[in-house]
A protein has these predicted regions:
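Active-site acidic short loop of glycosyltransferases
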Residues: 61-64, 94, 120, 142
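Structural microenvironment flanking redox-active thiols in thiol-disulfide oxidoreductases
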Residues: 80-118, 128-135
């Protein structure tokens, strides 16, 4: 009986150690899911001109679930995923989801692209400052497309460099 009790204590001790390690891992994951103070300030203070002559103020989107997609007209994967992002936006805008496309491109090319492709979500002309913002949000290589998904509290849900699949996009909702 003593041997069984000893084994039980070892098993319980092992479970306790595993739980502690898992808890520490979750804690680190939560911390990693928060944006740096510099990134938060840069994001919420950013303003971008839009194709229709307005100003897109990122602070107006704070407090809502938000998809930020960095793209360019010359980036084939970017333009391939835009219809998928548009479908997600149209299906989920009424549920409180916001989406912004930040174009790392020349405004004339963006206007031309948008005149030929219906996109429902707001587009901002980010230019090279958009590349800097993308780097602050985790796109160290500066590649496109780059997408960041934030919850309503500004916590990071997903960050992806590269083309999104329909399954990845639908998993956000």
């Amino acid at each position: 009986m003593q041997l069984n009790n000893s084994k039980r204590q070892m098993v319980l001790g092992g479970v306790a150690v595993l739980a502690a390690v898992a808890g520490a891992g979750l804690s680190q994951k939560k911390q990693a899911a928060n944006l740096s103070m510099e990134a938060e300030q840069a994001l919420w203070n950013a303003e971008f001109d839009t194709p229709d002559g307005r100003v897109l103020k990122m602070q107006n989107l704070q407090g809502k679930s938000l998809v930020i997609n960095f793209w360019a007209t010359w980036c084939a994967p970017c333009v391939e995923e835009m219809p998928l992002l548009d479908v997600f936006f149209r299906q989920n805008a009424a549920k409180g989801w916001q989406m912004v496309g930040l174009a790392i491109d020349q405004p004339s090319r963006v206007r031309q692209y948008l005149s030929q492709n219906a996109i429902s979500y707001p587009i901002g002309f980010a230019g090279m400052s958009g590349t800097d913002l993308g780097r602050l949000l985790g796109n160290e290589q500066g590649g496109l497309p780059f997408t960041v998904v934030l919850d309503g509290k500004g916590g990071l849900i997903q960050r992806k460099l590269g083309k999104l699949s329909a399954q990845e996009i639908q998993a956000w909702a």
